[in-house]
């Protein structure tokens, strides 16, 4: 059984509306509904629609308010596909141009391996990101300084910080060698008709 299935729930069906959340201090820091594209031992893929409602946990949190809270309670960018290989400490976001819808870049979000819950998936962002433009294998590291500051002030233990750095470095090497685990054809994936409708919450939409 994969780590993403560790709590014993069954795989979610294609099109199911589930909760995707970051959990901090034992409670949701941010959560939002997504639609399931794939849920297998090798791949979990979910779609976040433009305009989806974002729900933020009530302060105080040890890391402060979630940074997305500055931008309101809706996902304002184009819809995105999030790809996760169970057990790995990152997900890959397929980012598109907001105006044209054209594939723009792979955005590797370093985070805790997704943990399956009865309502969806739980993780926690680890700050470091890798950005790979559509026309290049050349990647750009992002927010390393933020991660190192969190490590310095104790938001990550020394062991956790070492593991996070290693995960980011492993993904960077895989990309540079053209050996990334995800299928690049996902850059051409389009959501089915009706999936761009606004999602308010996983409870109401998934019932």
UniProtKB/Swiss-Prot annotation:
Binding-site residues for CDP, renumbered to this chain: 68, 74, 76-77, 142
The positions annotated for binding a divalent metal cation 1 are 109, 125, 129
Q: Which UniProt keywords apply?
A: Antibiotic biosynthesis, Cobalt, Hydrolase, Manganese, Metal-binding
Outcome of mutating residue 142 to A, per the record? 10-fold increase in KM for (S)-HPP-CMP
Keyword Protein biosynthesis on this protein? no
What's the Enzyme Commission number for this chain? Answer: 3.6.1.-
Give the residues annotated as active site. Answer: 142
User: Which family would the database say this protein is a member of?
Assistant: Belongs to the FomD family.
Q: What is known of its domains?
A: Comprises a large twisted antiparallel beta-sheet with two additional alpha-helices located at the C-terminus.
**PANTHER family named in the record:** PTHR39159, UPF0374 PROTEIN YGAC
The protein's name in its UniProt record: Cytidylyl-2-hydroxypropylphosphonate hydrolase
Tell me which species this is from.
Answer: Streptomyces fradiae (Streptomyces roseoflavus)
């Amino acid at each position: 059984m994969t780590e993403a299935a560790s709590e014993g729930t069954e795989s979610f069906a294609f099109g199911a509306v589930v909760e995707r959340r970051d959990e901090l201090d034992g409670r949701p820091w941010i959560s939002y509904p997504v639609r399931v594209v794939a849920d297998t031992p090798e791949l979990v893929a979910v779609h976040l629609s433009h305009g989806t409602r974002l729900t933020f946990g009530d302060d105080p949190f040890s890391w402060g308010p979630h940074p997305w809270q500055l931008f309101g309670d809706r996902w304002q960018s184009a819809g995105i596909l999030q790809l996760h290989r169970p057990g790995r400490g990152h997900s890959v976001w397929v980012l598109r141009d907001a105006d044209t819808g054209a594939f723009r870049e792979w955005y590797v979000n370093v985070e805790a391996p997704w943990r399956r819950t009865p309502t969806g998936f739980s993780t926690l962002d680890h700050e470091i990101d890798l950005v790979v433009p559509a026309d290049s294998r050349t990647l750009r590291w992002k927010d390393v300084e933020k991660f190192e500051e969190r490590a310095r002030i104790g938001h990550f233990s020394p062991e956790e910080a070492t593991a996070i750095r290693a995960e980011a470095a492993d993904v960077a090497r895989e990309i540079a060698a053209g050996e990334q685990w995800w299928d690049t054809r996902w850059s051409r994936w389009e959501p089915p008709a009706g999936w761009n409708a606004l999602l308010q919450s996983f409870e109401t939409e998934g019932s």
